[in-house]
Amino acid sequence: FHNRIAAEIRLPEAIDRKLLCPFQYFGVTDTVDLDQLRWSRGGYDKGELSKIYTLSGAIADRRADLVVRALLKYITDIDEVKGLGFCVSIEHAAFMCRYFNEHGIPSIYLTGQSPDVERSAAKQRLVAGEVRFIFVVDIYNEGVDIPEVNTVLFLRPTESLTIFLQQLGRGLRL
């Protein structure tokens, strides 16, 4: 468009115009101290984040338990959830999937390496209500349309407003 914006719309206006659904945002504070983690390429080192979120034993379990308890506190009916959980690494997505399954919340995970047929099957299972969550890493920030998604879990920090809004948008479709 010769460096001209054809149209621009902000989140509040899109909600007011009923292009996106209104939402409730719940911030849950965990007890994980990230102060000592290395900073790499404008964010926390993903390898270090992955270790603390998956391999730190009681810390990782306590954080995952906090997520499950908060979910059960704020969600009216867990059987109606169709959610995405954004994770920092393949190990983190697998850990969260396993933890949710162990706590009676049917879940699966996908990564950037998951073949299209697996992604399609996962989407169908979520829409059909066979699973409550798909935990993802390096996919579904954009380019996926699952209007049935009604819950988004931000399970990793991001310094990018663009990525945050893209992930939030996965749960705002009408």
What feature does the model see in each segment?
Residues G57-D65, C87, D116-V117, I134:
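Conserved phosphate-coordination/catalytic loops
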Residues F1-E80:
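Interdomain helical connector at the RecA1-RecA2 junction of SF1/SF2 helicase-like NTPases
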Residues E159-L174:
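Conserved SF2 helicase motif VI
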Residues L84, H92-N141:
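Conserved helicase ATPase core of P-loop NTP-dependent helicases/translocases
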Residues H2-R4, L20-Q24, H103-P106, P147-T151, ...:
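Short glycine-/polar-rich loops that comprise or flank the Walker A/P-loop
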Residues D16, T76, N101, V127, ...:
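Residue-level signal for alpha-helix termini/capping positions
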Residues G112-P115, P157-L161:
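Short, acidic/turn-prone active-site loops that include or flank metal/cofactor-
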Residues F135-Y140, V152-E159:
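Conserved helicase core region in the C-terminal RecA-like lobe
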